[in-house]
Swiss-Prot record:
Can function as a Delta(12)/Delta(15) bifunctional desaturase and behaves as a nu +3' desaturase. Introduces a double bond in the fatty acid chain three carbons away from an existing double bond to biosynthesize polyunsaturated fatty acids (PUFAs) endogenously (PUFAs are essential for membrane structure and many cellular and physiological processes). Its EC number is 1.14.19.-, 1.14.19.6. It is an enzyme of class 1 (oxidoreductase). Pathway: Lipid metabolism; polyunsaturated fatty acid biosynthesis. Keywords: Fatty acid biosynthesis, Fatty acid metabolism, Lipid biosynthesis, Lipid metabolism, Membrane, Oxidoreductase, Transmembrane, Transmembrane helix. It comes from Caenorhabditis elegans. One of its GO terms (biological process) is collagen and cuticulin-based cuticle development. The chain crosses the membrane at residues 45-65, 69-89, 203-223, 228-248. This is Delta(12) fatty acid desaturase fat-2. HPO-19 and T05H4.4 are cytochrome b5 reductases required for PUFA desaturation in Caenorhabditis elegans. HPO-19 knockdown or mutation alters FAT-2 desaturase activity. Although FAT-2 lacks a cytochrome b5 domain, its N-terminal contains a DUF3474 domain that may possess some oxidoreductase activity for electron transfer, obviating the need for an extra cytochrome b5 enzyme, but still requiring cytochrome b5 reductase HPO-19/T05H4.4 to become activated. Belongs to the fatty acid desaturase type 1 family. Disruption phenotype: The fat-2(wa17) mutant leads to high levels of C18:1n-9 and low levels of PUFAs. It is a multi-pass membrane protein.
């Protein structure tokens, strides 16, 4: 069956899925040790400092890496910068959610210190990302990676349909496509983009944008005003950081079996249960503050649990979801040492969502696989 095969989605013929009783957020929270909800500012700041030290170490090492290992070493350095840059982003990510500390001023300050150097406008990102957590797996309201329905897909141009299939697209999706150009949620740098509705939002956008511009200018000065050096040692590492971030966020919510819901079927807990913990291995999960393999816990309590408590909270959440383990709503975890190739594979095979039941969508390939299995 080809990528353009149309799946029959006549809504009148769709069954209604009977949803088992799902635990409340309060019930899940009660299963987690209380200290997991404690936000220690000093601990949080220590991770911010740690990531800066790692980045400084990589910059100190790059002349030697390039001298002894040439372009192959430089390519490896770019990947390392992408990983550590994403770790720094994750600290700012805690700041944006308020899980960094109980002090809003400290969260905002450290959030800008973490995000501005990697050209991620803190307050605009905070605004768009919040809606992703509030409406996870909602076909219309979820933000970040847009859900593509069969109708959306059929109305796209060839470039729009197959851009994601091109491997190099991953390096461009975060910066410049998402944050600067503003696809699909609106530019995070332009105060009058559709992302912002109030004067306060626009002022915050301008402040965060200026912070990014200052960091970029400082980098340009440190590069001795050389565009070539600036691109080679500052902007290209940021493209790798954007790639890693895109892969992290994509894999956390994508596989053939996950469900996406229309408004009448969506619920907060039901949506969060479609999140997937992915273990990358090789120490990468730890470097990136367990945002990869502790993401289910983060999604349930994104404003309450700091990243350094996610792994301890995860077994408790798994236990709370244990009665649902044989359903669509159980705890989900995969080991993905092949995370980069998994990402590339999904971009080819997961093209669009189609209805599997009334108000419930699934990727076309998953629906077809289920039908083929049922027909056997």
């Amino acid at each position: 069956m080809t990528i353009a095969t149309k799946v029959n989605t006549n809504k009148k013929d769709l069954d209604t899925i009977k949803v088992p009783e799902l635990p409340s957020v309060a019930a899940v929270k009660a299963a987690i040790p209380e200290h997991c909800f404690v936000k220690d500012p000093l601990t949080s700041i220590s991770y911010l400092i740690k990531d800066y030290v790692l980045l400084a170490g990589l910059y100190f090492a790059v002349p030697y890496i390039e001298h002894y290992l040439g372009w192959i070493g430089l390519l490896g350095w770019y990947w390392a910068m992408g990983i550590v840059g994403s770790a720094l982003f994750c600290v700012g990510h805690d700041c944006g959610h308020g899980s960094f500390s109980d002090y809003e001023w400290l969260n905002d300050l450290c959030g800008h210190l973490a995000h501005a150097p990697i050209l991620a406008p803190f307050w605009p990102w905070q605004k768009s990302h919040r809606q992703h957590h509030q409406y996870t797996s909602h076909v219309e309201k979820d933000k970040g990676h847009p859900w593509v329905t069969e109708e959306d897909y059929n109305n796209r141009t060839a470039i729009e349909k197959y851009f994601a299939v091109i491997p190099i697209s991953g390096w461009l999706r975060w910066n410049p496509i998402y944050t600067i150009v503003g696809l699909p949620d609106g530019s995070h740098f332009w105060p009058w983009s559709r992302l912002f509705e109030t004067t306060e939002d626009r002022v915050k956008c301008a402040v965060s944008g200026v912070a990014c511009a200052i960091c970029a200018y400082i980098a340009f000065v440190l590069c001795d005003y050389s565009v070539y050096t600036f691109v080679k040692y500052y902007y290209i590492p940021l493209l790798f950081q954007g790639l890693i971030l895109v892969i992290i966020t994509y894999l956390q919510h994508q596989n053939e079996d996950i469900e996406v819901y229309e408004a009448d079927e969506w619920g907060f807990v039901r949506g969060q249960t479609q999140t997937i913990d992915r273990h990358w291995g090789f120490g990468l999960d730890n470097i990136m503050h367990n945002i990869t393999n502790g993401h289910v816990a983060h999604h349930f309590f994104f404003t309450k649990i700091p990243h350094y408590h996610l792994l301890e909270a995860t077994p408790a959440i798994k236990k709370a979801l244990e009665p649902l383990k044989d359903t669509q709503y159980g705890y989900k975890r995969e080991v993905n040492y092949n995370w980069f190739f998994k990402y590339l594979h999904y971009n080819v095979t997961l093209d669009y969502l189609t209805h599997k039941a009334k108000g419930v969508l699934q990727y076309r390939s998953g629906v077809e696989a289920a039908k083929a299995k049922k027909a056997q």
